[in-house]
Amino acid sequence: MSGIPGNPSRFSSARSFSPPVGRHLEPLDRIGGYYIDFGEKAQTPRWPPPWLKSRREQLHVSTAQWGLGAYEKFLDGGDEEWLAAARAAGEHLLELQTAGGPLDGGWAHLHPMPHTFRLDPPWLSAMAQGEGASLLVRLHLAGGEERFAEAARRALGPMRVPVAASGVLAELEGGPFLEEYPTQPGSYVLNGALFAIWGLRDVAVGLRESSAGAEFERLADSLAGSIHRYDLGFWSRYDLYPHRVANVASGAYHLLHTNQLKAMQIVAPRPQFGAAVAAYERYADSRPATARALAQKVLFRLLVPRNRLAKGAASR
């Protein structure tokens, strides 16, 4: 998408890359569509998708998002072919879910983290755990199979294990935080944390698990209390890792942050989330803010190239 002054797409294809708030999202104690509309992720209902890599190279969020996108298309028109596609993605996640040991319930990545952060295999991602749980809960509700529900419950296990013990639970400003990339020191990636905690909400609401509901509320409160740290005064931050310069979000991720916080205002409203949405939208409409964000992103990538492991970031 060509850049438009005052629009986040000025320095990325933000509108096409960043999906909107889910059209079938249920605000009350019901599970409908996903919080973010991943429909564009699934172009056809054929499984496996052509991008699926070997076991040792897979990023499990890609599988979960493809399945959630297929489920969204099923909700659009009731086409059972799309539900079967979502189910195929869920079956794939069941096959790859770790059984036993310190990574029990997790979807382990068997390759090093390919960019920005240094993570050696095997490593887990709270984002993958949450999105995987969200897909499996929906498959259970659609077909009644308990094995999907049980796998969704198990997916939450690593969220209760500290990063230092091979889990994905960290602490930020005295509250819990779920790490997309469980680095030490913490990276605190905003979009990944939001995708992660939605898995807790889906297990809580869809499977009537009160403990998951309590964890979701604690995490929502904690994130609301620390959301100000992602506001640079002109744009949002991608993470809080102590890089040499702040990792300003790309236009696409800035828009994703905005849409994710809009979804949070539907299911777990907090004044801090609403204030962040207003600020982020104001920045996106500002030509000077957009230009400044572009300049800082360029500087960041000069110092921390995307295609090279970040120096100084210790593995788990």
Locate each region found by the language model.
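Glycan-recognition and catalytic cores of secretory/periplasmic carbohydrate-active enzymes
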Residues: 1-316
